């Protein structure tokens, strides 16, 4: 299957390019109160080290807005302010923030949106039209209900509103809490405009449910060439949002980065403590940003075949096993020594690639 990404306009959020030929960026949103400057910066730094590209923050009132100005001055990542109901907060924040997300369903009148556009245009920052199936404008929900038809009408109405005011630094999201409807919404909007898309499933739930829903919806869209930036929404799991998003990009084959771990599900042939080994390997390799395929297999049935396609591999046997690199056996050791040697080979593989670059 040939991957061909839909060519969109390119915009800029801080120092991050979105759309065009730019890599697909990964976003998250803080769950602190924005007025908690120290707590917000702590979460931003966690996301930075987890591999996030952009962070969004809620802004409920002027206390949040003033705090956001100080947070922005100290943040290692571009910041987007998330505005609902009070358009004046977007106008105030525009001069020091990297982007604004508005919800057309609750930002208020056309005049309110015009004021936000004027501020963003003067400050040269983009706007995300964040259409959400749970908060569609009344004029569209009355006619179409709260389904995909209403979302499309809302998106196109607001795109035209911004364009009529000569504003084109736009990205769009079409979020629902249902994977199938999310796919439909983005697919139907894609031929109608060339603005970059922010992908996501809203209110996706806790780690398990969010991972399943997001993998289905975002993976499906990415494989069809749709999507320029993305967030895996997950209740209370900052680093996991980034980890799952990067895994979706990696395992869909759309954007390679980090470690791809191949490991067997275990069966009655296992004669080693594979579960402990894989947990150690996962923990010790999660910091790696280089695209790397590693294999941890519990017996010889598939181990050697998988090892041929892996950069570094372990093939466990009874009380012993093999460490394999690029299909060649580099060590035969007793079980207690295998994981340490394997991890050493992984680190050496990463270093060798850095040197080549």
Swiss-Prot record:
GO terms for biological process: isopentenyl diphosphate biosynthetic process, methylerythritol 4-phosphate pathway; terpenoid biosynthetic process. Its EC number is 1.17.7.3. It catalyses: (2E)-4-hydroxy-3-methylbut-2-enyl diphosphate + oxidized [flavodoxin] + H2O + 2 H(+) = 2-C-methyl-D-erythritol 2,4-cyclic diphosphate + reduced [flavodoxin]. Its cofactor is [4Fe-4S] cluster. InterPro entries: Dihydropteroate_synth-like_sf (IPR011005), IspG_bac (IPR016425), IspG_bac-typ (IPR004588), NO2/SO3_Rdtase_4Fe4S_sf (IPR045854). [4Fe-4S] cluster binds at residues 264, 267, 299, 306. Pathway: Isoprenoid biosynthesis; isopentenyl diphosphate biosynthesis via DXP pathway; isopentenyl diphosphate from 1-deoxy-D-xylulose 5-phosphate: step 5/6. It comes from the Bacteria. Keywords: 4Fe-4S, Iron, Iron-sulfur, Isoprene biosynthesis, Metal-binding, Oxidoreductase. Belongs to the IspG family. Converts 2C-methyl-D-erythritol 2,4-cyclodiphosphate (ME-2,4cPP) into 1-hydroxy-2-methyl-2-(E)-butenyl 4-diphosphate. This is 4-hydroxy-3-methylbut-2-en-1-yl diphosphate synthase (flavodoxin).
